Curated annotation (Swiss-Prot):
Protein family per UniProt: Belongs to the YPI1 family.
Name under which the protein is recorded: Type 1 phosphatases regulator YPI2
Organism the protein comes from: Vanderwaltozyma polyspora (strain ATCC 22028 / DSM 70294 / BCRC 21397 / CBS 2163 / NBRC 10782 / NRRL Y-8283 / UCD 57-17)
Keyword terms of this UniProt record: Nucleus
Keyword check for Nucleus: yes
């Protein structure tokens, strides 16, 4: 029951400077240079603010969804039609009685 509580740097930031915690020498708001952006993002998005990047990302998503509406749904998205099977079962049932 005597578990030591640990503070995780990227989640918890102490309010008092004299508290021991994470020595934050990194920036949470900036993306590291080594991480590559997704292939759908253009190079121009790097210089834009959060809201503008989000706006462009949403627009790309909407455009992609709009372009994909012509494609046929996959097998998991199509509800099977059992009406013929039901008719056969009803006929079989009525013939047996």
């Amino acid at each position: 029951m005597n578990k030591k509580k640990t503070k995780i740097c990227c989640i918890y930031h102490p309010q008092d400077e004299d508290e021991e915690g994470c020595t934050s020498d990194h920036q949470h708001d900036e993306l590291p240079e080594s991480s590559s952006s997704s292939s759908s993002e253009s190079e121009n998005d790097k210089d834009l603010g959060f809201d503008e990047r989000r706006k462009r990302r949403v627009e790309r998503r909407r455009r992609k969804l709009r372009d994909n509406t012509d494609s046929a749904p996959n097998a998991y998205e199509v509800q099977p039609d059992y009406s013929e099977h039901r008719k056969k079962m009803m006929e079989k049932k009525s013939n047996n009685t």
